């Protein structure tokens, strides 16, 4: 290396790791040597063999892999140094992660280095050196001195220390390494952000916006992240950090495909793309009142200033989900804003989380696809107007069948739609004591509800009065949606149950989809469902029932959608029923105008043989 230097103390360093165990006994092997100086023009040129190459000018020492010892080593020679390695591991996998884990500034000499692995091994036959000499650090140092500047520039590597958030486009170009640039990490703490992930993979080149935190079906972080690197070399080094620790949790790292990353990190929403394109610091707000406004959010964060963009998350029908994303211009403002976690807007406490562009895309995409799920596609088609052409039966004996319901309805059974009786089962596959019946029109449903409400049904020796309410197809769709989300197969008709061996019930925990199912308003004579957030571990079903039971309303059912833990509060859905007086008893037939009898010829069988259409609910 005939490099003319301006400082006599400038040095070259050849760094490698003593072994591949990376434990407390692993050391850095550092070989220090100095470049040759050009002779004066009046002197004869010096050949490489006659240049100063004695062993006294090439020294090797061991350095402990601790921040203190490494910093001390570089401070001994404060001038700039050229670092050479045989592969990226000493810099990218050992030294830079060492400083990142301890939240220390990376020394400037480590920001770039010369990787001579491919160049040096590729020239081993040309140089005429044996394998034993290649492994000798002194021999490698002498070979480096013989390389010219142009050859060395080809080996120059720059380490990108800072991670750059950015939106990922669907038409993003794929690099030369193709699909071998993505890994999946599991086991992240719930409070981990994209910057924690970047710290875990410090020293490796991550593409701008290449960290995509994954969300569960509820829209919450599930402890997984997909990371896209700029090269396969960085991805392979990332796999070596399998079972390393992040925030006291060990992380599992596996290979993943580029299509998996693109599915999570990209989206088709123009509004979301415009929001994340600002490259500001994103914070997610959860638990907002449904009528929350832009001004209330800005007041909530005062005296901090937000950017002009606030993204409210809504369902496809325009109803808000209680989530929003805001942006801060600086990291300092974002950290101050996160200190307002669990403060209130109105009567609701607000949860705050640092977010990413990929998380914004996932939440918006999930809300846009919620109404295209198989559960909704299979639901009973609801008309544009909310016609109450259904009736809901409550208090049925568990042994009740469709035939018992038809007998209970009496003359009103002739006004039931074909295959219009829907039994409701819980998530263990047992009858819930409820049923939905589709009538031919609203007048028939109203007359049926008024005519048989609080009448008695006899099943064997049991005799119970049945509550009958007029309902809409939307309520039926809601229960059908909840039932489809369970993974429990529908039970067989009761006629076959006697032939099956008894099975012990297998309770399953119910997890609702994100966003939460819609809430019906409280209407006298009907039921409503309330979603309760922030439930403490000490709160159970008895406490919820006691708190929400009033002279006007009674709690019919409590469904925990998330059990409270010491890390995360719980959520539950409460079913309330109005205790208002039932409608006055009137003549059912007087409320029906010009109802024609159904055409039994159109049925393939007798209308009383309604096939069982089970749906599941909690």
UniProtKB/Swiss-Prot annotation:
| Cellular component GO terms, alphabetical | nucleoplasm; ribonucleoprotein complex
Cited InterPro entries: ESRP (IPR050666), Nucleotide-bd_a/b_plait_sf (IPR012677), RBD_domain_sf (IPR035979), RRM_dom (IPR000504)
> Which key words tag this protein in UniProt?
mRNA processing, mRNA splicing, Nucleus, Repeat, RNA-binding
Swiss-Prot/TrEMBL GO biological process terms? embryo development ending in birth or egg hatching; embryonic body morphogenesis; mRNA processing; multicellular organismal movement; regulation of RNA splicing; RNA splicing
Bias category Low complexity: which stretches? 45-59
Effect of inactivating the gene? Worms lacking both symn-2 and mec-8 die during late embryogenesis. Lethality is probably due to defects in alternative splicing regulation.
Main location, first listed in the record:
nucleus
Domain (RRM): give its ranges. 281-357, 389-473
Location in the cell: Nucleus
Region named Disordered: 33-59
Molecular-function GO terms, alphabetical: mRNA binding; RNA binding
Name the source's superkingdom.
Eukaryota
| Function (record text) | mRNA splicing factor that regulates alternative splicing of many genes in embryo. Probably plays a role in the formation of embryo-specific isoforms.
Which family does the similarity line name? Belongs to the ESRP family.
- Put simply, this protein is called RNA-binding protein sym-2
Q: Which organism is it from?
A: Caenorhabditis elegans
This protein's encoding gene: sym-2
């Amino acid at each position: 290396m005939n490099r003319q230097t301006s400082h006599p103390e400038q040095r070259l360093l050849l760094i490698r790791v003593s072994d591949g165990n990376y434990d407390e006994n692993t050391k850095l092997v550092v070989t220090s040597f100095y470049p040759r100086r050009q002779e004066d023009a009046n002197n004869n040129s010096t050949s490489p063999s006659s240049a100063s190459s004695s062993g006294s000018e090439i020294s090797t020492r061991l350095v402990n892999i601790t921040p203190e010892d490494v910093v001390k080593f570089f401070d001994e020679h404060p001038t700039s140094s050229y670092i050479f390695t045989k592969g990226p591991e000493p810099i990218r996998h050992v030294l830079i992660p060492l400083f990142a884990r301890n939240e220390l500034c990376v020394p400037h000499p480590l920001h770039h280095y010369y990787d001579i692995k491919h160049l040096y091994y590729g020239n081993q036959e040309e140089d005429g050196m044996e394998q034993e000499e290649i492994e000798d650090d002194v021999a490698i140092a002498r070979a480096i001195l013989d390389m010219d500047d142009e050859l060395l520039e080809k080996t120059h590597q720059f380490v990108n220390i800072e991670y750059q958030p950015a939106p990922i486009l669907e038409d993003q170009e794929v690099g030369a390494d193709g699909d071998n640039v993505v890994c999946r990490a599991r086991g992240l703490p719930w409070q981990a952000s994209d910057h924690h992930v970047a710290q875990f993979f410090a020293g490796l080149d991550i593409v701008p916006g290449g960290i995509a935190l994954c969300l569960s079906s509820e829209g919450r972080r599930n402890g997984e992240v997909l990371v896209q690197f700029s090269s396969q070399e960085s991805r392979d080094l990332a796999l070596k950090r399998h079972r390393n620790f992040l925030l006291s949790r060990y992380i599992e790292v596996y290979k993943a495909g580029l299509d998996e990353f693109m599915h999570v990190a990209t989206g088709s929403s123009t509004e979301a793309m415009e929001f994340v394109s600002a490259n500001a610091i994103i914070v997610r707000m959860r638990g907002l009142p449904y009528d929350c406004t832009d001004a209330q959010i800005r007041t909530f964060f005062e005296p901090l200033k937000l950017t002009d963009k606030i993204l409210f998350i809504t369902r496809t029908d325009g109803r808000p989900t209680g989530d929003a994303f805001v942006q801060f211009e600086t990291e300092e403002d974002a950290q101050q804003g996160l200190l307002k976690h669990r403060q209130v807007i109105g009567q609701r406490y607000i949860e705050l989380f640092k977010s990413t562009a990929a998380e914004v895309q996932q939440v918006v995409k999930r809300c846009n696809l919620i109404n295209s799920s198989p559960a909704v596609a299979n639901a009973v088609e609801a008309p544009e107007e909310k016609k109450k052409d259904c009736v809901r039966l409550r208090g049925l004996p568990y042994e009740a069948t469709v035939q018992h319901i038809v007998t209970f309805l009496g003359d009103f059974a002739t006004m039931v739609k074909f295959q219009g009786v829907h039994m409701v089962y819980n998530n263990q596959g047992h009858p819930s004591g409820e049923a939905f019946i589709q009538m031919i029109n609203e007048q028939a449903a109203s007359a049926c509800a008024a005519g048989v409400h609080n009448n008695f049904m006899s099943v064997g020796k049991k005799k119970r009065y049945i509550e009958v309410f007029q309902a809409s197809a939307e309520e039926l769709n809601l229960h059908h949606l909840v039932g489809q989300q369970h993974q429990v197969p529908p039970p067989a008709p009761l006629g076959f149950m006697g032939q099956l061996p008894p099975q012990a019930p297998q309770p399953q925990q119910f997890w609702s989809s994100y966003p939460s199912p819609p809430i019906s308003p409280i209407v006298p004579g009907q039921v409503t469902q309330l979603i309760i957030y922030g439930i403490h571990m000490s709160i159970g079903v008895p406490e919820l029932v006691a708190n929400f039971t009033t002279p006007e309303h009674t709690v019919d059912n409590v469904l925990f959608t998330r059990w409270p833990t010491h890390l995360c509060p719980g959520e539950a859905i409460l079913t309330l029923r109005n205790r208002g007086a039932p409608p006055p008893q009137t003549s059912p037939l007087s409320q029906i105008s010009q109802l024609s009898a159904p055409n039994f010829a159109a049925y393939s069988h007798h209308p009383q043989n309604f096939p069982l259409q089970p749906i599941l609910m909690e």
